[in-house]
Amino acid sequence: DEQTGSKGPNENLPSQKDLXAKASXLTEV
């Protein structure tokens, strides 16, 4: 699953995803 990006990319995305989600507000993923 690490190759599929279940832990690697996901761990690096949380920061951008959270910011985006908070900035959008509409997209709470």
From Swiss-Prot:
Q: What is its main location?
A: secreted
One GO MF term attached to the UniProt entry: toxin activity
Per the record, the GO terms for biological process are: killing of cells of another organism; monoatomic ion transport
Q: Where is the composition biased (Polar residues)?
A: 1-15
Q: Where is this region: Disordered?
A: 1-29
Tell where it localizes. Answer: Secreted; Nematocyst; Target cell membrane
| GO cellular component term, pick one | membrane
- Which keywords does UniProt give here? Cytolysis, Hemolysis, Ion transport, Membrane, Nematocyst, Secreted, Target cell membrane, Target membrane, Toxin, Transmembrane, Transport
User: What's its job?
Assistant: Pore-forming toxin that lyses bovine erythrocytes at nanomolar concentrations. Is devoid of enzymatic activity. Binds to monolayers and efficiently permeabilizes small lipid vesicles composed of sphingomyelin and cholesterol. The cytolytic activity is not prevented by cholesterol or sphingomyelin.
Name of the featured protein:
Cytolysin Uc-1
